[in-house]
């Protein structure tokens, strides 16, 4: 939550209103509830912030990656049937993913794992431009030492905010 809260503060300084789907370390259903909350708001965009893990115990994996929505017929939308494949939403999601990834790598110097597409529920069920960021690997002991640092959280939040502002500059009418 540290990076999310710092991002909120950065965006508020830019004059951007921020809706948090959670403000503490508690669970909010990621399959539909976060998207439902977002869809009921008047938000311009959605960012889901995570730290990665391979699930293989100790890992050598490193870096930051950003995801935007990829349709998969095996995973049909539950609450976003109308907008999940909307061309404008998808184009704006791709721009957001690229602007944020570029800013994160520039600010942190982390390994660039790239911008990828996936059918994650929070990306599928959210009716506005949406991305999911993975900010480093918690199961890599050396990377974990970096991502545990408050100063690194500050840099991540600054980069995320800059990526959002770059997106606003690139997308007309926002």
Residues covered by each model-derived region:
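Active-site-proximal helix/loop segments of hydrolytic enzymes
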Residues: 1-174
């Amino acid at each position: 939550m540290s990076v999310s809260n710092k991002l909120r503060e950065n965006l508020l300084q830019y004059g951007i209103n921020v809706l948090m789907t959670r403000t503490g370390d508690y669970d909010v259903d990621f399959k539909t509830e976060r998207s439902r909350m977002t869809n009921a708001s008047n938000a311009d965009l959605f960012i889901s912030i995570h730290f990665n893990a391979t699930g293989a115990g100790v890992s050598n994996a490193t870096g930051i990656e950003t995801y935007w929505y990829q349709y998969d017929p095996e995973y049909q939308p539950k609450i976003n049937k109308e907008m999940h494949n909307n061309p404008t939403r998808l184009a704006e999601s791709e721009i957001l993913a690229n602007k944020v990834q570029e800013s994160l790598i520039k600010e942190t110097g982390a390994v660039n794992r790239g911008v990828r597409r996936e059918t994650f529920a929070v990306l599928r069920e959210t009716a506005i431009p949406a991305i999911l960021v993975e900010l480093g690997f918690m199961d890599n002991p050396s990377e974990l030492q970096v991502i545990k640092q408050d100063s690194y959280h500050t840099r991540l939040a600054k980069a995320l905010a800059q990526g959002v502002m770059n997106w606003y500059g690139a997308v007309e009418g926002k």
